[in-house]
Amino acid sequence: LVLFTGGEDVEPSFYGEDKGRFTRCNKGRDNLEFQMAADFYNVPKLGICRGAQFLTVHSGGRLIQHVENHGVSHNIVFEYPVKGTYEISSTHHQMMYPFNLKEVDYRVCAYSEYFRSELYYNGNNKNIDLPKNFVEPEVVYYPKTKSFCIQGHPEFSSISDDFKKLMLRIISTMLNV
């Protein structure tokens, strides 16, 4: 298992956009992690926060460069591989956007219980058009790259131990580790 962790924003040029005013990147780290992801292509990968965003881009997805109201604890709704609503801590202002991919190339496992952001900015600092059935993805699996991506921070101490144990079981199930 290869773990990709939190940190600076992913360089937007890697997903075909210009850098917006809210975006702060470390292109050196991005280059290093793209090389690591290539070297370990067939190894299961787990991304948390920025790591989830990075693995989304590595898997061919895009990012929404800026969203509002996601830097706090909030509820997410799991639909796969379990069902239920759980609290998770978040510190992000960017968001995974797998919806440009074919549906067979990703699975949204969990999403925000309700829309937290009123605006979704791209690199031109403009509100983007969202697909018809848009949800704010919080947990996404990319089968081709064996990448399981968690936008929030299940490891934070404010989250219940039961949820942490559940997340470990989900990660083990999804990545077969």
Which stretches of residues belong to each language-model region?
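Glycine- (often His-adjacent) and acidic-residue-rich active-site loop
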Residues: 12-19
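Catalytic nucleophile loop
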Residues: 40-60, 153
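Class I SAM-dependent methyltransferase SAM-binding "motif I" and its flanking Rossmann-like core
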Residues: 63
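A short acidic, glycine-rich active-site loop
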Residues: 21-31
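Amide-donor transfer/coupling interface in amidating biosynthetic enzymes
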Residues: 4, 29-43, 66-177
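Short glycine-rich anion-binding loops that position phosphate/pyrophosphate groups of nucleotides
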Residues: 7-10
